[in-house]
Amino acid sequence: MSEKRELVLKAFRGESVDRVPVGFWHHFTTEDEWLHGFENPEIIDKNKAGHKKFIEEVKPDFVKLMSDGFFAYPQPAFKDFKSISDLQTIEPLGANHPWISAQVDLVKSLIADFPEDIVAIYNIFAPVTYLKWLVGKVSGGDDLIADYIVENRKALKHVLDVIGEDIASLSQRVIEEAGTDGIYLSVQSIQDERVSAEIYKEIIAPSELKVLEAANGAKGHNILHICGYEGARNNIELFKDYPAQVVNWAVGPEGISLAKGLNIFRGRTVLGGFENGKDGLLYTGTKKAIQEKVREIIADTGTHGLIIGADCTIPSDINYERIEWVREAAIL
C-alpha cells in the first residue's frame, strides 16, 4: 500500500496521521457539456484528459473522479411528461444499462492511467438531483420538485426510488468492477420552503440512503457532500445520520465549522475548510494567508478525522501551486 493511500484511509477512519491529507478537485468540462457526454464521446475524452493533467501536475493525496458528461439520467419517460403522475409506472434502467456501463468503463480507464497508487472516489449525485437537473436544466428545478410533491408525492417517491435503484447499481459497479475506492454522494436540501424536513425525510431521503447503503455494501470508503452549489443553503441536521465515513459541506455559508461538524456527525471525519469560489482565500490569497488558514483549521478541528479541502469544486483555472501551499502547511 502506498504512503498516500495509507494516509488517506487512516484519515477516513479517524486515526492518527503525521500529515493532514488534502483534497481539492474541479470540473474538466463546461456546464453546458455536463448533460451530454453519453451521446458525445468528445466530452468524455475531454474529461479523461483533464484528469490526467490534474493528477500529473497536482500529485494529489487522493482524487475525486468527475462524472462530467453523465449528469443526464437517460430515462425515456422523462423526455415528454406532462405530470409527475405520468411516471408512476416507470422501472429502473437496470444495472447493465449502457449509461451505467459507460461510467464503469470511464472509471476503469481513469484509474488505469494513474501514475501512482492513490485513493479514488467517484462522483455520484442524489436521485432527486438527476431528476432536478433534467427538469431544471442543471441549475434550478427545486420549485418543480416542490410542485411534484404538492401534485402527487407518492408518484414522486416512486420516481426517486427507481432512480435510486439505478444509482445504487452504478455505485456498486464502480466500486466492485471499476476499482474505485468509494463514492462521493452529493446531496442538497430542496431550495423551496414547501419542502419541510419531514417531507424530505419521507419522500427524498430513502432514495439517497439506498445509494449509500449499496456503496457501503460494496465495502466503499464513501464521502457525503452536502452541496452549496450556486448559493444553495442546507439543513445540515437532515443528513447527520447518513452512513458515510466522511462528510463535506460549505462551512462559511452554512455557518458550521469543521469542529462543530465533528460533533454533529458524531466524530466522523470531516472534509473542507476553504471557500471554493473565485472570491475565496484559496483562489486569491497570498501563500502566507493560505498557510495561516490551514494552521487555523487544524488548531480548531484537531488532527484526527480531518481532511482539508473546499466547500465544493474549485475553479478550473486555479493555479495548482496554491494546492501545494495547503499541503505544505498541513504537515504536523
Task: Describe the predicted segments one by one.
Residues M1-T29, H36-G37, G50, D61, ...:
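Active-site loop segments of alpha/beta catalytic cores
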Residues W25-D32, D61-G94, P98:
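Alpha/beta catalytic barrel-like cores
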Residues E33-V58:
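Active-site-flanking structural segment that lines cofactor/substrate pockets
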